[in-house]
From Swiss-Prot:
Biological role: Site-specific tyrosine recombinase, which acts by catalyzing the cutting and rejoining of the recombining DNA molecules. Essential to convert dimers of the bacterial chromosome into monomers to permit their segregation at cell division.
Domain Core-binding (CB) residues, every copy: 16-121
Organism: Streptococcus pyogenes serotype M2 (strain MGAS10270)
HAMAP family with a match to the protein in the record: Recomb_XerS (MF_01816)
Tyr recombinase domain: residues covered: 169-354
Chief location of this protein within or outside the cell: cytoplasm
Family statement: Belongs to the 'phage' integrase family. XerS subfamily.
Compartment(s) of residence: Cytoplasm
Name this protein carries in UniProt: Tyrosine recombinase XerS
Keyword Cell division listed: yes
Amino acid sequence: MRRELLLEKIETYKAIMPWYVLDYYQSKLAVPYSFTTLYEYLKEYKRFFDWLMDADLTKVPKIADIDLSTLEHLTKKDLEAFVLYLRERPSLNTYSTKEGLSQTTINRTLSALSSLYKYLTEEVENDQGEPYFYRNVMKKVSTKKKKETLASRAENIKQKLFLGDETLAFLDYVDKEYEQKLSNRAKSSFRKNKERDLAIIALLLASGVRLSEAVNLDLKDVNLNMMIIEVIRKGGKRDSVNVAGFAKGYLESYLAVRQRRYKAEKQDLAFFLTEYRGVPNRMDASSIEKMVGKYSEDFKIRVTPHKLRHTLATRLYDATKSQVLVSHQLGHSSTQVTDLYTHIVNDEQKNALDNL
């Protein structure tokens, strides 16, 4: 979604929200939470508030009138009824005949509500320096996580990684072969964005940054001499990230055409730009996802930018055997989340031994 459209949608949701949700939004914007995250949270709050009114748990005529007392006095049974509603309601805006939302979507909804309740009961201060209320019913609501062993997850992910020589082969394919299959009209569009697209893919493969971190990069955040970029991690922490040397040429080629190709002026701070009707804009997450999916599907298998992050992490662990180093590269505070890469690498080693 383009940034301008995203901000428009956010304003639409803000216009119907209670005052305390607007306080929450302002507080999290200062962290900073990304606009994408806040947009998703606002959608979840609307879903929840709509249900409160439909279930007669509040007698007000519109969402903006739902008061703090309503949230304070909701019971565990009320929230469990909401979860059951989510699990059984028909999916909207889809051709699927499947009843109910996925567990992943339900967990996302509950996560958004937990964040709001934590803000209202712990983080915010009223005139007396106290939170708005103390009872956090969300602490009593359990979430169900998908059960899957690390070995099983590693096996599923491994097929979607560009390991070994495939990392550079993927870049080389986009650079030299992809164009050959295109019509003359499609070639024109491809050539316009070729350097930018290659720079994005190379950066993801060479640094392992999250999609949101790549989207939010500004020119000042990129140091090609040191091959270091500055990013805002989850939770608003600023971090310096090393970038593998193979990405340097692609990034330099993009920078050489960025100003002329995308009509960038001094006020256009975003590193990765797109141009629409002569106006440069920051490239958004959905456009990058589609771009990565398009090229990767033609090369081998359709993947997301997050799989390129997994690719970097797996290759780095394979080269160093250090979970601590991989955790630091990815911006994780613990090595627990990097256990996945040990399973992938160990499986690769076993396959290599079997072929001896």
